[in-house]
From Swiss-Prot:
It holds the Pfam family SMC_N. Contains large globular domains required for ATP hydrolysis at each terminus and a third globular domain forming a flexible SMC hinge near the middle of the molecule. These domains are separated by coiled-coil structures. This is Chromosome partition protein Smc. GO terms for cellular component: chromosome; cytoplasm. The keyword Oxidoreductase does not apply. Belongs to the SMC family. The gene is smc. GO terms for biological process: chromosome condensation; chromosome segregation; DNA replication; sister chromatid cohesion. Required for chromosome condensation and partitioning. It comes from Aquifex aeolicus (strain VF5).
Amino acid sequence: MEKRAYIEKIVVEGFKSYGTKRKEIPLGEGFIAVVGPNGAGKSNIGDAISFALGLSSAKALRAKNLSYLIFSKNGQKADHAYVEVHFKNLGAFPVEDEEVVISRKVSKDGRSIFKINGQVVRERDLKDFLAKAGIYETAYNVVYQGDIVKFLKMTPVERRKIIEEISGIGEYERKKEKALEELAEVELKIKEIDLILEEISNQLKRLKEEKEKLEKFKELQRIKRETEAKILLKEKEKLLKERERILNELSSLRESLEDITFQIQENEKELNERERLLKEVNEKIMPFKEKVGKFTAEIENAERSIKEKERELKESENRVKNLEELINNLLSDKENLEREVGTLQLELEKLKEEYKSLKEVEREKLRELEEEEERLKITFDEVKKLEEEKEKLTEKLNSLNKEKQELEIQRANLKNKIERIKEDINKLISEREEKIKEIKEKEQEIKRLKAIKKKEEEELRNLTQELNIYEKRLSEVRKKLEEVLKEKGAIEREVRSFSDVSDVFKDIKGVYGSVSELIRVKNPEHITAIEVAGGGRLKFIVVEDEEVAKECIQLAKRMNLGRFSFIPLNRVRVEERPLRYPRTKGAVDFAVNLVEYDPKFEKVVKFVFGDTLIVENFESAKAIGIGNYRMVTLEGELFEKSGVITGGAVKPSGELNKRYYEEELQRLNAEEEKLKNEESIIQKKIREIRNLISEKTALLKVSERKIEELSSEGLEQYEEKFKEKLENSKEYLKILEEKLLNVEDKLKELAEEIEYYEEKLNNLKLKEGDIKRHYSREGVEEKRREYSKVRKQVSEIEKSLNEIERELNKKTYELEYLEKEIQEKEREREYLTERIKSLKKEIENLILFKEKTLQEVKEAEVKVYDYIKQKEELEKEILNLKSKLGKLKIKEEELKEKIFEKEKNLKVLEEKIENLNEELKEYEDLKLGADEESIPKLKEKLKRVTEEIQKLGSVNFRAEEDYAEELKRFNDYKEKQQKLKEESKAIKKLIEETENKKRKVFLEAFNQINKSLKRIFSFLSPGGKAQMFLDNPEDPFSGGVQLTVKPRGKDVQYLEAMSGGEKTLAALSLIFALQEYKPSPFYYFDEVDAHLDEVNAKKVGELIREKSKEAQFIVVTLREVVTSFADKIVGVSARGGISEVFFLKNEGLEEIIKEA
């Protein structure tokens, strides 16, 4: 089913001439004619449609601005202008509703509101909505009064854009834009990789130098190691010789030492015997000594262990005791807290009752006590004062202890906070490193993107300049080509008007042609003068001989062609004389010298022109002398030698012009071909540049978007934020630490204060005890205790009543803290309880062991006494023998010292040799041959090599690995670059395919519309022709669409030269051709038939009637012949300046037309 729509009705309110009331103008399908007198408001129907659909500006609607569209006349003024256009939707609009209402309201301040079916929309959204139904921004379907020729006055590009819009190639444009954006993304990545590859290339160059430096370093190191190894081998050889000498000396010294050693051995045998006996005694003593020593050590260890374990036991028991007490207290506190939290309000009431009761008892007890004291004449003030002071001290201590507890909780909280802040600071510092790395990477990428953007912007500027140059050149070429084509057309017409007299004889052998055909005027300015100079002789036909002339004459007679003159080459005679003319100003030259010809026809040319002199003008001829020469001026005046002067208007015969025009035509054809080739080349270049500009523009948009995305936060901004966070954290940490110090100081002060008050309270208690003892002696103490007890209870209740509200707020927090504390203390108590059991067992075992060991020591000391006496006698004998041996050993020692010195030197040598061997192990991988160089020379060589190594400076020992890694990275990026280039190539291919499809769709639309245009115009103007052609068929989007019209009986002419009726027919033909390709839901024509005669108006009416079967036509007309074809006639009249609408039948039309 064909999709279409039409306007059912228009609703206006406060719009232009239609007054302030809401009015409906029914329209309907088919051909609707709108008629009425001039000024009645007919055109305002079309203005209302255009206004509501946003198809025209205020200027096009004949208003200064939109607020001028609001009705205002005779003091009446509407608040707004409002128009509704009701469409019957038969599938044209992309909604399911059968009725589509589009409305627009403009207020006095010029603001507009558009709506579709009651929903407010933007103007852009409305235009998109209308375009889907075939109502476009170009509004080719709306023709205002006197505006029909706008379709002819359109520039070729505007005409092309209408066809583009109707052909629906927008989808291809969107695909192309999307592909261009994808291409820009890929190209941007390629550019980034290009920069990275450039960076890597620089790195590779540097690393290659470092690698070569490392290789040189390694070579020098190899030479250095070889030289070092050779030096070590030479030094080892020297040390081996020295060792051999010392070994020989040692051999002699050792022989002397052996003799002394023998004497010493003999004396030592005897000494040994005594020492053996001493040893036996010692061995007998030793077990006892060892046993005693062992027992003593064990006893000491046991005592030490007992002390340590007893100390640990005592500490653990004390700690357990403290813990149990603390846990009991904590549990008690916990129970109290739990009970108090649950029953605090009830307890408060109970305490108040109890307080009231106790207060009464207190007063009674106080009265009894005072009576007793009065009886004993003892004042109770002092006791009461002590009681109050003690109570105050107790309260103060309780308050201080509570404050201490709160401070301890506060201290724990502060420590936790300090730890958390320190952790946060460490975390912040750790995160900073990662963030800085991330920001630096982003900054590097931004740097690359900005470099690419800068380069691309520069290239875009250059391309734009280049495009402007080429477009300017293209415009010049096209202008020049147009001039060439005009000139060529004029020349072609001139050439066609010529007829060669020699053509009838062209088949006869020996005929060369007319004189005019055989010569060529050198300068076009001389053509008129040469034609006059040659006169009728220029038409003479040149033949070979008289026989040929005879044959031609006979042919002319047979065919009754008229008379001809012939010049036989074998008979022509000329007078040979030198041609001289006075060298006077105004003389040009003899005519024979101003033409070109074949030397074969020289006599003919001289015969025709003789001695005729060409001069510039009449005055020049007079100056030379009339009658002296046969002369012709450039304007054609002829001066005969006889004095006869011939002149006046000269009508060119064209005999010479033909040759000139033919040559000029050849030149122009060549120039046309050249210009067309140049045009094609320039167009191709412009296409390439435009494609590049599109790619560069898309790439710049993508790079700008990426730079914006990456530029969220720079290193400087982050560092500022980091420093601020760090400083804030450190400041907060400092504040917390200061608070902690303050809390610690307060706790210290509280401890001192608590200690002071506790001591003071003890003193008061002692003083109170003295008084109470005095009272007890007097029988008052009992009453005093009763009173104190009651007084204490009252005080406690008062204290509870005062504190209960304050305590209630702390209970929950303290309860949580107590539970944690209890759990921790219970775990510690369990551990210590087990430890105490273990310690007690260990101590018990150690005491038993100690007692047993002491008993064994006593028994051993009795047995060892006799052995000690024998030991003392043997020690005396041994001392004498040792004295004798002393002298021998001194001599032995001297020898040994010498041997030792030698051995020491030998050892040093061997150590050196060993060290050299160790050092030489580092050079085991070297293959060294015999070297005759001395150590000094080798050291000199080593020094030289070392200096060369130092000259190399710092060496990158990872150069080879770095080079390999960077080369791999380079190759990886190269591979990525290749893949991206392939992707870019694929996208470009897609763009090209899309462009080809777009071109194909456009050309199909163009060809179909052009075909319809030819047919419709030939119908409206029989014998006439109209067609469109593309400026550039190969690339239609680089040029425009030209329109040529040839009305019946006329040549092709410029549109400006056509009559109003001809222009109307041409414009309507184009509109109907567009309508045939893609009909708009409606067409609005306002007096498009104004310039048409009756016949053409009738044809237009017939055509509209025919086309109205496919689309709605709303036509404002004053022509009865047009209206006669309408399906419905809407009449418009004006009463009191307000337009009214009514329906007419064709019979009432004539009257309306006459009124108009």
